[in-house]
């Protein structure tokens, strides 16, 4: 389990782009993570997406999954951004959206390590609300030294 203070040690993102509120399960040996993002009407993106029918933008759901995957990657390497390592989100495959995410939802973020080759990491990810899958796909990250 990781609270927001520890999450901030592993992710360089800050408001309004830090999209992981808590890690509830982290299994480095099993190479998987489960975290969540509480989706509030106060999120800045709801002002324009869409004012009369607020929906969390799909690209931000993908980014939230990528941030959870990044935490897993850092933990697997036993490094932090302060150590001079960063993960860049470089792509996605097989991404599918199944239902909208709205204010008041708790977005569960799950990532499982698939492979790493020449500093390119691939994770299988999904996002859920009320145990229903809202998004799934593969996240691709590049590990770089700063």
UniProtKB/Swiss-Prot annotation:
Compartment(s)? Cytoplasm
User: Under the cellular component aspect of Gene Ontology, which terms does the record hold?
Assistant: cytoplasm; membrane
InterPro entries recorded for this chain?
FabA_FabZ, FabZ, HotDog_dom_sf
Q: What keywords are annotated for this sequence in UniProt?
A: Cytoplasm, Lipid A biosynthesis, Lipid biosynthesis, Lipid metabolism, Lyase
Specify the enzyme's EC class, one word: lyase
Return one Gene Ontology term, BP aspect.
Answer: lipid A biosynthetic process
Concerning SUPFAM superfamilies, the annotation shows:
Thioesterase/thiol ester dehydrase-isomerase (SSF54637)
Question: Molecular function (GO) terms listed?
Answer: (3R)-hydroxyacyl-[acyl-carrier-protein] dehydratase activity
Reactions catalysed according to its record: a (3R)-hydroxyacyl-[ACP] = a (2E)-enoyl-[ACP] + H2O
Q: Which residues form the active site?
A: 49
Q: Which Pfam families match?
A: FabA (PF07977)
- Enzyme Commission code: 4.2.1.59
Q: What function is annotated for this protein?
A: Involved in unsaturated fatty acids biosynthesis. Catalyzes the dehydration of short chain beta-hydroxyacyl-ACPs and long chain saturated and unsaturated beta-hydroxyacyl-ACPs.
- Which PANTHER family does the entry link to? 3-HYDROXYACYL-[ACYL-CARRIER-PROTEIN] DEHYDRATASE (PTHR30272:SF1)
**Family from the record:** Belongs to the thioester dehydratase family. FabZ subfamily.
What this protein is called in its record is 3-hydroxyacyl-[acyl-carrier-protein] dehydratase FabZ
Q: Which species?
A: Azotobacter vinelandii (strain DJ / ATCC BAA-1303)
Q: Encoded by which gene?
A: fabZ
């Amino acid at each position: 389990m990781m609270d927001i203070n520890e999450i901030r040690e592993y992710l360089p993102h800050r408001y309004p782009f830090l999209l992981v509120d808590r890690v509830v399960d982290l299994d480095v040996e099993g190479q998987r993570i489960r975290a969540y993002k509480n989706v509030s009407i106060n999120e800045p993106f709801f002002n324009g997406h869409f004012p009369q029918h607020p929906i969390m933008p799909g690209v931000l759901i993908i980014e939230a999954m990528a941030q959870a995957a990044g935490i897993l990657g850092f933990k697997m390497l036993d490094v932090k951004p302060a150590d001079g390592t960063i993960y860049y989100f470089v792509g996605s495959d097989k991404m599918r959206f199944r239902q909208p995410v709205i204010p008041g939802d708790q977005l569960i973020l799950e990532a499982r390590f698939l492979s790493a080759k020449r500093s390119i990491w691939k994770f299988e990810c999904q996002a859920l609300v009320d145990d229903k899958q809202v998004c799934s796909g593969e996240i691709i990250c590049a590990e770089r030294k700063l």
